[in-house]
């Protein structure tokens, strides 16, 4: 998968993170999609501490052990919480502005890196993918590449902690039946574009994955997925490990 590293001119989230870190406040981080109305991400939420995190995230951090890889680490909130627990973590992100903020905030090992880059190497006991961690896969068709990457980076006996959401509630009729065309793309495949002030990012694909589909594709690629906990908004935390 070719996911390019971002430049500051095309990195609205990184700019918002840098602004909030420098000034203690930020403007609207706007989110656009062809499927939904315009929305916004509260930038303060990207700087939450452990006690402010949802229960699913707290559980994943508590269960993380050994050498940990924090994928798409953003402002570094999860990595910092792990460090406070005395755990060893490497944080990666494709945003240079975010990586700069992480280092300034005290993340000991943060680097600019694409998770899917074949040149990125390491052996990790835990791979942490939170805040809809399945999102970076982009499309169902990319799941084999995702599992190939896990095989390359997971240490023997290692596991992935990943959260995601089932969007079926958006497509259910009054009787609870799924009202979708089976010839359409998978209903969890979404496109987004972000904007912060005058900085507009490129459109990107984002994957929301129901647990049954995750479990099926995991099994087809030599892994097993276990649903560890359910959230309050059709979200869940999964543990993924080699069979």
Walk through the language-model features, giving the residues of each.
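Conserved SAM/SAH-binding beta-strand->alpha-helix loop
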Residues: 95-96
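Class I SAM-dependent methyltransferase "Motif I" SAM/SAH-binding loop
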Residues: 72-76
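N-terminal auxiliary segments of SAM/dcSAM-dependent transferases
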Residues: 1-30
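Conserved alpha-helix/loop element of class I SAM-dependent methyltransferases that forms part
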Residues: 47-67
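Conserved SAM-binding strand-loop segment of SAM-dependent methyltransferases
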Residues: 106-117
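SAM-dependent methyltransferase
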Residues: 19, 155-215
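A short SAM/SAH-binding and catalytic strip from SAM-dependent methyltransferases
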Residues: 124-144
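A short glycine-rich, Lys/Arg-flanked "PGG" loop and its adjoining helix->strand segment in the class I
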Residues: 143-156
């Amino acid at each position: 998968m070719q996911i390019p590293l971002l430049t500051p001119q095309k990195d609205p989230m990184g700019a918002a993170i840098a602004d909030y870190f420098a000034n203690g406040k930020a403007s609207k981080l706007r989110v656009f999609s062809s499927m939904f109305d315009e929305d916004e991400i509260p930038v303060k939420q990207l700087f939450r501490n452990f006690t402010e995190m949802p229960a699913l995230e707290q559980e994943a951090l508590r269960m993380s052990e050994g050498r940990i890889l924090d994928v798409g680490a953003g402002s570094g909130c999860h990595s910092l919480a792990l460090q406070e627990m005395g755990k060893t973590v490497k944080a990666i992100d494709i945003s240079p502005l975010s990586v700069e903020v992480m280092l300034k905030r005290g993340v000991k090992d943060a680097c600019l890196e694409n998770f899917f880059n074949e040149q990125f190497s390491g052996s990790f006991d835990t791979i942490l993918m939170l805040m809809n961690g399945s999102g970076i896969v982009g499309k169902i068709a990319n799941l084999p590449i995702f599992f190939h990457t896990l095989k390359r980076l997971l240490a023997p006996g290692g596991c992935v902690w990943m959260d995601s959401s089932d969007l079926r509630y958006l497509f259910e009729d009054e009787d609870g039946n799924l009202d979708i065309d089976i010839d359409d793309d998978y209903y969890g495949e979404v496109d987004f574009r972000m904007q912060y002030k005058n900085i507009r990012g490129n459109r990107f694909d984002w994957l929301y994955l129901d647990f049954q589909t995750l479990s099926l594709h995991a099994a087809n690629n030599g892994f097993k997925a276990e649903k560890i906990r359910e959230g309050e908004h059709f979200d869940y935390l999964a543990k993924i490990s080699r069979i």
